[in-house]
Amino acid sequence: MAIKTYKPYTPSRRFMSVLDSKDITAKSSVKGLLTKLKATAGRNNNGRITSRHKERGAKKLYRIIDFKRNKYNIEGKVAAIEYDPYRNARIALVVYPDGDKRYILQPSGLKVGDSVIAAEGGLDIKVGFAMKLKNIPIGTVVHNIEMHPGAGGQLARSAGMSAQIMGRENKYTIIRMPSSEMRYILSECMASVGVVGNEDFINVSIGKAGRNRHRGIRPQTRGSAMNPVDHPHGGGEGKTGTSGHPVSPWGTPAKGYKTRKKKASDKLIISRKKHK
C-alpha cells in the first residue's frame, strides 16, 4: 500500500503523510454492525483523570468485529474492504449464503470476491481461513489468536502483525509472538491464517498536532517543565536535567523498569521478548 506525501505549502504539511485509500471499496458501512461506544476520555466513574493525555477525539462508531470466527463450515465471500476508525488495520465485510454479514480483520492479500471459511477441523492453508491451532502446520504465520478456547482472538490483531507456530507439546502449541516472546497456547484455540494487512501504517508520519487531537491524544507536558510540587523532575533555574534516573510523576522508574505483576500464566511463557 502506497504512502502519500504532500508539498510543503504549510509547515504542518511538510512532514505529514497518509496512507493511500485505494484499497477501500465500501462507500458506507453495514448499519447492523455499528454501535456506539461511550468515550471516557481517560476518566473513571468519579470523573477523575486516571489516564493522562486522553480526550474524546473525533466522533466515530464502533464496528462489531467477528473475532471468534465461530460460523463453522460455511463459506463466505468478501464483499467489501472498509476503513475502521477504531483500529489501524482494514476490515473485510464477509457475506454468507444465509444472508449473515460479519466483519473480520483483513489479512494481507485478501481481496473482494475471495472466499473465507472457519472450521474446527482441518482446512487448506489459505489467507483468511480460520481453524484450531492443532490443525495448522508448524511454521505457518497466523493472526487473531485466541488465548482461551471460544473467547475470541486477542493476539496479533494490529496492522502488519503476525505470530508463527513453532511446535507442539502435549495439549499446547508453541507460538512465537510479534514481540519475539515464545509461549504456550492451548491447541484448541482458534487462529486465522496470514498477516494482518495495512502493513505500511507504521511508516505514516502524523506531521501535525491536530491529527493526534482527532485521534483522542492530548499534548504531553515534560516533567522538567513543571514545578517541583508537580513532578520529581520539576524546578531549577533555567533548563536543568534530572537528578538520578527518570521517573514518572509518582516516582516509578520510567525507563526499563518492569511493572508487570506475576501471574499464574507466567508458567506458559517459555522465553521473554528479546530487547534490541
Curated annotation (Swiss-Prot):
GO biological process: cytoplasmic translation
Signal peptide positions (record): none
Positions with biased composition (Basic residues): 257-276
InterPro entries: NA-bd_OB-fold, Rib_uL2_dom2, Ribosomal_uL2, Ribosomal_uL2_bac/org-type, Ribosomal_uL2_C, Ribosomal_uL2_CS, Ribosomal_uL2_dom3, Ribosomal_uL2_RNA-bd_dom
Region (Disordered): 212-276
Keywords, sorted A to Z: Ribonucleoprotein, Ribosomal protein, RNA-binding, rRNA-binding
A Pfam entry, by short name: Ribosomal_L2
A cellular component annotation (GO) from this entry: cytosolic large ribosomal subunit
Family indicated by similarity: Belongs to the universal ribosomal protein uL2 family.
Subunit structure: Part of the 50S ribosomal subunit. Forms a bridge to the 30S subunit in the 70S ribosome.
Role description: One of the primary rRNA binding proteins. Required for association of the 30S and 50S subunits to form the 70S ribosome, for tRNA binding and peptide bond formation. It has been suggested to have peptidyltransferase activity; this is somewhat controversial. Makes several contacts with the 16S rRNA in the 70S ribosome.
Protein known as: Large ribosomal subunit protein uL2
Organism: Helicobacter pylori (strain ATCC 700392 / 26695) (Campylobacter pylori)
Primary gene name: rplB
